[in-house]
């Protein structure tokens, strides 16, 4: 039985974490002994981890990192992690150099600075593994590179490398040492290889895995909008972070309201910008028009019930929220940026817009006043996702009803095949 370790930063309800859960389900417990290490000991999705996966954390807090209680716990964890194994002292020069670089660029990413320390102060794993897989950038990647004993080491990238704030100096050029590097989209791959061209021969695209039928099933469960609103509904799903550019969406909603459009915009997600966004909403008098609903355990009824799904972000890797919207046949409008361009074919299965309040509002009006076009985009998007799923299963050699499918999938993964 082969021993495999997966490492992820946290196990919260974001897209990469959900994709990891789906990937874990593809491994046979009869063939693999699977360990999971959550670097920061926290995240609400722990209860969805397959029962045959062994959580190696000595302590674990099953609370969202975005909730009030979760933020408090996360802060304590980070504080206590500064001191073990001399992590802070050992990385002091590293911190100063990278902080200086960030200050020159006027883009300070505190989380990126701290990942090295979080990695160096993590658990000491004495077990030898056949495969160790870092499923996220930053801490998980550093931990697998520096602190795991394994015959083969793989890592995943889920974001546009440079836009997200990573650099060779920040990573200490660790990527060439990995046996295989998987990116979730072609654009993520291209962005990464601009920084690490020497890794071209070992970098493959491995699309996020989604359980399409489970998403459709959950979309039919009770839930969704409960405000009785009779106008058009716009939905966005994602964490409240700078990457998602919600301030631009709020400004677009203001333009729509000023023009008399009968539309309401709903956001599912939590994050550090909640208070700031709430203030902006109040300043523009949009309390009844742009609603921050928080995180939802089952967001899929909202997708099914909305008139338009909008994902106007600064950059993406490959958005699982957009994939889910397409699976459910939503009309999708996304900003013209890395990641989004790869997911939506403008004028075929969705629409692209500039990350500008005026352009967003104009594209929204065009779509909401053209039911025939919306239906076309929704049909084409759902059809495309069905075909993509089939293509991925073919490459992964998984066909329903065959007992050997998991073995084939794992054998392919061992030989570095990718899912497309």
What are these regions (language model features)?
Residues 17-22, 232-255, 261, 272-278:
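A conserved mid-protein helix/loop that constitutes part of the nucleotide-sugar donor-binding site
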Residues 324, 336-347, 351-352:
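Short acidic/histidine- and often glycine-rich active-site loop of Leloir-type glycosyltransferases
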Residues 383, 387-420:
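C-terminal alpha-helical cap of glycosyltransferases
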Residues 346-347, 351-358, 366-371:
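Conserved acidic donor-binding segment of nucleotide-sugar-dependent glycosyltransferases
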Residues 295, 314:
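Aromatic "clamp/platform" in nucleotide-sugar-dependent glycosyltransferases that forms part
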Residues 257, 282, 359, 366, ...:
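A short, well-ordered alpha-helix in the C-terminal region of glycosyltransferases
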């Amino acid at each position: 039985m082969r021993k495999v370790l997966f490492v992820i930063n946290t196990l919260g309800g974001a897209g990469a974490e959900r994709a990891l859960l789906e990937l874990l389900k593809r491994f046979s417990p009869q063939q693999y002994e699977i360990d999971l290490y959550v670097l920061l000991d926290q995240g609400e999705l722990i209860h969805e981890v397959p029962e045959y996966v062994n959580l190696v954390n000595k302590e674990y807090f099953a609370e969202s990192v975005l909730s009030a209680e979760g933020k408090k716990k996360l802060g304590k964890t980070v504080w206590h992690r500064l001191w073990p194994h001399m992590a802070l002292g050992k990385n002091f020069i590293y911190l100063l150099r990278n902080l200086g670089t960030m200050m020159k660029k006027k883009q300070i990413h505190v989380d990126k600075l701290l990942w090295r320390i979080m990695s160096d102060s993590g658990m000491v794993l004495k077990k030898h593994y056949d495969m160790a897989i870092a499923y996220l950038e930053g801490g998980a990647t550093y931990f697998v590179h520096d602190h795991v004993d394994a015959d083969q080491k793989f890592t995943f990238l889920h974001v546009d490398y440079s836009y997200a704030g990573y650099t060779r100096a920040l990573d200490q050029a660790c990527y060439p040492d990995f046996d295989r590097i998987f990116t979730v989209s072609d654009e993520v791959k291209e962005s990464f290889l601009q920084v690490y061209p020497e890794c071209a021969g070992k970098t493959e695209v491995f699309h996020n895995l989604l359980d399409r039928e489970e998403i459709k099933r959950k979309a039919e469960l009770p839930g969704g909008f409960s405000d009785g609103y009779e106008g058009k509904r716009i939905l966005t799903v994602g964490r409240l972070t700078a990457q998602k550019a919600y301030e631009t969406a709020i400004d677009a909603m203001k333009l729509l309201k000023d023009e008399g459009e009968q539309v309401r915009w709903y956001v599912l997600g939590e994050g550090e910008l909640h208070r700031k966004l709430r203030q902006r909403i109040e300043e523009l008098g949009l309390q009844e028009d742009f609603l921050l609903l928080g995180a939802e355990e089952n967001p899929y009824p909202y997708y099914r019930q909305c008139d338009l799904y909008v994902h106007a972000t600064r950059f993406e890797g490959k958005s699982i929220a957009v994939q889910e919207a397409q699976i459910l046949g939503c009309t999708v409008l996304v900003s013209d940026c890395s990641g989004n361009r790869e997911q939506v074919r403008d004028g075929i299965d969705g629409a692209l817009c500039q990350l500008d309040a005026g352009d967003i509002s104009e594209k929204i009006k065009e779509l909401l006043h053209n039911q025939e076009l919306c239906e076309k985009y929704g049909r084409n998007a759902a059809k495309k996702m069905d075909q993509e799923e089939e293509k991925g299963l073919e490459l992964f050699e998984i066909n329903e009803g065959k007992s050997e499918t998991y073995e084939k999938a794992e054998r392919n993964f061992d030989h570095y095949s990718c899912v497309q």
